[in-house]
């Protein structure tokens, strides 16, 4: 007060009020504030005190009304609309209109919806009248409230709050006050009384939203006039004072407004009062209405009448609540009434009566039926007892009784049906009990919980429970790795053995059937060149074909299977040989396996200067699995460092003994570049062919294998097919794997179109519906209908297998949960892979599986042959994937779309580089780790005391010392101190670093216990890129 400023909480403390009461008054007076710690000026404090004392603040209110005259006029209109009848009683009170408008401004701003309903019901004068009474009441109440300051402010403050929330709250109060003095003065007619009640009711209904506890204070201290204003508020809150009359008035408005509307002819006001009333009863509930009648006795006659009106609507509310439990009773009475109706109906119609009697008999029979178990009888008796006890209260809903009675017979009949089902169930159980739990199961790879349960003859829930106790939350469709399966199987006493995977080179289908025996003819051999990368396979085939295919291969390595036809002259006859050139890179294992499976003779190419390498051993295993004869071509014999004998020696270790050493393997030293011994190699191939007696039936429908497939931008799906039996012609309907197609054109290895392809003939086929998988077998069908059926069934099988593979990718192992808990969420690298041919896609996917994926998992969202399209870009943008292209191109618009979406598109033509970049990207997702990098070693040779500390005179023995680097001080074998090198000087000058062989002074802020001979190790922490852990 001395400084001219007072904080709101200080004023409330001085007046012994709550902060919220003072804030409500500030809202009413439009005094700006942020919180209860805001300050008020002296003028504002005077205004607040006047309001709390019960007097209308004349100066501030007048100023507000003058400043905001347009707004006040608007509110006057709204208020007048509210009350039509009361205004007639108090038409001449326009003097104080300005003041109420100022206080009502906030109210009108907040609830715009409440204001409109008041307008229609009121006239121009009533608007002013309601506003006037609000202030006169306060002035009249001043003397009463002045003595007890604390309660009075509460009463006034709370009304202020109510206007802030809903606009109607402020207007109703003045209306009640204005009308109260008028009826007391002279009006004795019953109509005016009704008008008073209706007016009071709108006040309370509008004030219903106002704070409840604040109004309780008003009734206690103020006279009868005040309690009426505060009554609506008290009704909302829990009122302890003995003035329930106020709440009663609040409840009464619903019934009275209706009467007032009918009597006065103003339906609008009544309709608006009704919507406001339902809001109040919902909040306080029924109990509040009960409490109000008790204090109603001391109230005046008018109040008693109001209370009586209020209580009439209340009882229906109480009855509605208990009706819910009374529902069960209704069916009881309804059942009895139904029996009476049925008896009457039986007398009139004999047929109907007989039918109903039968039904009743059935019900009785069911009750007495021996099939009912003791538990069912008890349950039925309990249900009847409950129905009896609950049936007494009400009888309105008769139809519900029928379903209740009908349920009883159904329960009785169920046992009979269940008996038949029980028999069926028993039979099923007997059948299911036949399979015995195996003692040993064999596994090839991971499998789902459902598959494991079927294999072990164990309920799926038991397996899931077992996994749960191991800390693995698995579902029925989740895939388990072999280690987890072994542990689960051990719990059930079942041994697990892993099957050796069958080689992909094994020939699973016999192309020549018994029916072809009569039409067999000799066919050209299919020769596959296999061996390690860069050992000269393609160069050797070029030498045989006298072409230069290797020069066109990216990186000089073969990345597809190439099929070539070569005409060779032997003993004066022309012989045809089909060569398949397989990739030697480790990623192309599947291609080499396919090449071995379709081949008749395998040529193992080994470099004389390199010897046996990993892919050489793999090629040997493929040839043995395919059970095909093997010819070894020792290439690069023209080099100085060539050692053919050493190569022969290495091959003997793997069961390939040369003929000259007494074995059965043909070995020919050749030089692909110089063309040495090429004729000898071809002669050996033809000799082996004669021994093998290769035959086929060219007169039947073609069968064979898909060597390679890709999607051509112009020609669509293109597949390289090797016909192994029969003849393939243009127009034939064929199924390759799950792909249906009709041969539209065939092109040989030289680019010439052909009309028919005989056995051992490799051609490119156009006209397939989709790109088949490399390695799939194809067969020609006579009609398209049967071919389509086969293709559809295979497509369904492939879809199911893909789903299982997708589930397997979310592999669950015993270490998964703990690893994810330690590392956080498992990081993933999303890829979209597009390659030129299907074989390349397989090779890349196989190589990606070999990458360590403990910390970062590779998710291939799409892997398909063909060019990179805008659809691929959209998928990558939505999933945050990187598009990897291998020997492919971008479709028109794909590059622009990728630039706009910010998608990373990488194109490769060498698989080495592709795999290296993907591994680098996986490592880039890992958080870098801090690694200690040693800088040097420093020896302390002297100690100088400076003030309270000491400086070490040192000599840099090795490396260097850098200011602010990390150091360790060692004394003998003990670590004395670890910290940071704070000060580094040379010749009394600060330096950043001192190199080896120089002296320097070192000072530390937190260490000074130097001794001569101490060794200081200098190092720094650097971030190092983490590598993938195997």
UniProtKB/Swiss-Prot annotation:
InterPro entries xrefs: EF-G-like_DII (IPR053905), IF2_II (IPR044145), IF2_N (IPR006847), P-loop_NTPase (IPR027417), Small_GTP-bd (IPR005225), T_Tr_GTP-bd_dom (IPR000795), TF_IF2_bacterial-like (IPR000178), TIF_IF2 (IPR015760)
Region spans: Disordered: 56-361, 394-434
Region (G1): 531-538
Gene Ontology terms for molecular function: GTP binding; GTPase activity; translation initiation factor activity
CDD domains associated with the record: IF2_eIF5B (cd01887), IF2_mtIF2_II (cd03702), mtIF2_IVc (cd03692)
Protein name: Translation initiation factor IF-2
Residues given in the record as GTP binding sites: 531-538, 581-585, 635-638
Keyword Nucleotide-binding appears in the UniProt entry: yes
PANTHER family in alphabetical order: TR-TYPE G DOMAIN-CONTAINING PROTEIN, TRANSLATION INITIATION FACTOR IF-2-RELATED
Keyword presence, Translocase: no
Functional summary from the UniProt entry: One of the essential components for the initiation of protein synthesis. Protects formylmethionyl-tRNA from spontaneous hydrolysis and promotes its binding to the 30S ribosomal subunits. Also involved in the hydrolysis of GTP during the formation of the 70S ribosomal complex.
Gene3D superfamilies registered for this protein in UniProt: 1.10.10.2480, P-loop containing nucleotide triphosphate hydrolases (3.40.50.300), Translation factors (2.40.30.10), Translation initiation factor IF- 2, domain 3 (3.40.50.10050)
Taxonomic placement: Bacteria, Bacillati, Cyanobacteriota, Cyanophyceae, Synechococcales
Gene Ontology CC annotations of this record: cytosol
Region (G5): 671-673
Domain of life of the source: Bacteria
Stretch list, region G2: 556-560
Location of the region described as G4 in the Swiss-Prot/TrEMBL record: 635-638
Domain tr-type G: 522-695
NCBIfam families: IF-2 (TIGR00487), small_GTP (TIGR00231)
Primary localization: cytoplasm
Bias type Basic and acidic residues, positions: 134-144, 188-206
Family: Belongs to the TRAFAC class translation factor GTPase superfamily. Classic translation factor GTPase family. IF-2 subfamily.
Compartments where located: Cytoplasm
Region (G3): 581-584
